[in-house]
Amino acid sequence: FLQTKPGLVGNFTYGKYTKSSLNFGGYNMEFYTKAVDNKVVASYGETLGTALDFYTKKFGDSNSGKKIIVAQIDDESLDFYSTQGMIFMATRLLEQPREITEERLQREAAYQWWGLTVGLKSFDDVWLSQGLAEYSAVTLRESTTDAAKLEDLRRSEGVIVDEVGARTRLARQSTTPGGAPVPLKIGDTLELND
């Protein structure tokens, strides 16, 4: 392996895999899986390819180039892990496809830019890459959602758009003692509690 630009330490996985190659939006994606339904691989490939294409158009090329590898790992590890040009996914995510997994895959794709292409000065800056990756994924979902569903998406994502178009991600909207959401207005100051 040769890496000519500074970056985080890479990783590898070893096992008996089935290789599935997909092309989407100019990206060559290789999925290395163990006994996973081809429809799931195709669906995740489309999700990943759409995300990579969107981020490339929005932010320019990432250091990982036009090839990305997705490798299945065991459930005893993390759900996802991203390194330059590679995304690791836990087995359960490939065996039980859900919408939330596709949303997280969009975020993992964004790490090819935030934290890997745009590096971190120190470990204390990790929150920046996490926030920018989440922002990128929400922006992608907003761009592919019709107006009727956009408000629901913003509420479920906890995103409020102010009058100048700046986006602020909230952990969760506050609720009244009865459980009803507290109405928020542009310019409100929010206190987020753990």
What does each model-identified segment do?
Residues 1, 32-194:
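Hydrophobic alpha-helical and helix-loop surface patches within well-folded domains
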Residues 1-26:
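Structured beta-strand-rich cores of soluble
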Residues 9, 24-27, 65-66, 83-84:
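Sequence-level motif detector for i,i+2 pairs with an aromatic at +2
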